[in-house]
Every structure is written in structure tokens, then in C-alpha cells.
Amino acid sequence: ADAFVSAGSTGAILVGGQLIVGRIKGIERPPLAPLIPTKDGVALLIDCGANVDARPSHLVQFAQLGSIYMENVVGVKNPRVGIVNIGAEEEKGNALVKETFPLLKECTGIRFIGSVEARDIPQGVCDVVVSEAFVGNVILKLYEGVGATLISKVKSGMMTSLRSKIGALLVKPALKETLKSFDASQYGGAPLLGLNGLVVKSHGSSNAVEIKNSIIQCVQFKQQKINEKIKENIILKQ
């Protein structure tokens, strides 16, 4: 097989992927990297659940992997990279963020724009959102929860009166597309980047649409020869 898609245990997929498929030479920790919606398109959240004890060198590689993926799979030229922080200033953040920041500034091959606060992520201020897995997973789950709540609230609000029902009919096409962008199943799963093969982790509660889109991800990944480009472009030492 050229690819593996699973909605099973994240831990089992991580261990199996590294032991059976193996890491690309020089990759320290393969991260999970799902696409998330933004005001003008999508961003890549990396890492969202694979490495809760990440080191600065890991986050630098996440930035490189994310840039390669966004440019070659999503088609974003010279993608902007930001690191999740509690403020925009360079001196803010925990020890991990403070140690990683100067490394990202010095890293060639990426377009680092600095710290990004969580509230700015949906605004599309960057194309690659770098974090360790704990923070990334919290962001991802909040996205999923807010998206599901928003869709539910809008649908129920449209049925409250005859006027709202008529209004809903008038804006239905545009509204449908907008709400679709908040549906996590539209983006497929999260590729485990940095492996010698292609492994995609879908949500444990995935429906048929998400599995289908995860398979489409695999096709795009394979067609664009992402692993070959990672091997060619990854900078192993900072």
C-alpha cells in the first residue's frame, strides 16, 4: 500500500508509524498536522497531538515540515509561519517558546512572522501555526467545538419564525458554503509528517465524508511527492 488511513487510537498510530514505516532520516519527532479554517482559507496546525514533550529543535522542524506541506499540497507560496504564544512580543511565553523563537528567526527556508495569539489564528494571520502537542490539541478541539456549535445555532436560528425562514432561503447558497468551512469533516485527517510513508490520522468519530477526504489527502500527498521534497528541503541542524 502507498498510504495508511485510520480513525483508531492516536498512540497506536504514532507508535506503529514510527516502528513499521520509520522516520525520514534526520526527523526527530513526526508531528500531526491538520488543516483548520481561517477567514480567507486554511492554515496548518502543527503539532496537534503527537509530541507533548517537544523541544525547541522539534518545533523548528515542525515549521519546516509545515512550510513544505502548505506550499506543495495546499499551494500557498512562501507560507507565513507563526508560533503560538500568549502575546505578540518576543520576550513573552513559556521556556519552550522563548527558546524556540530565536531559532525560528534564524532558520532559513521558512518565512517566520513571529508570535501568534490564539485569537488571531482564525483571522488567517499565518499559514503554518507551530505549537507543541498539548497546546495544539486544545486549539484543535476548541475549533471543532465552536464550529459544531456555530452550525447548530445558525440552523436553529433560521427556524424561529416565518421571516427567518424566508431570509434563510434567500441566503442559503452562501450560508451553506460558509457553514461548510466550519465542518471539520471537510478537511480530512491529520497527516503524520516526517515518516518514510504516508500515514493519516482521522478523528475517532469520523463520518464517511472525513474518511473520503482523508483518502483524497493521501492522493494529493503522493502526487506532489511530499516525502521526496521533505528529504530535499529539510534543514537538519540549526
Segments from the language model and where they lie:
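Glycine-rich oxoanion-binding loops at beta->alpha junctions
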Residues: 1, 50-55, 115-122, 186-187
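Glycine/threonine-rich beta-strand-loop-alpha-helix active-site module
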Residues: 2-3, 8-58, 62
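Short glycine-rich or small-residue beta-strand-to-loop segments that form or flank ligand, phosphate
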Residues: 4-6, 45-51, 80-87, 198-202
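Short glycine-rich anion-binding loops that position phosphate/pyrophosphate groups of nucleotides
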Residues: 9-12, 86-89, 118, 134-137, ...
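Buried hydrophobic packing segments
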Residues: 13, 17, 63-66, 100, ...
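Short secondary-structure boundary/hinge segments and terminal tails
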Residues: 13-14, 121-123
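Glycine-rich phosphate/nucleotide-binding loop
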Residues: 18-31, 37-45, 125-129, 133-238
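Glycine-rich phosphate/diphosphate-binding loop of Rossmann-like nucleotide-binding domains
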Residues: 52-118, 127-128, 132, 144
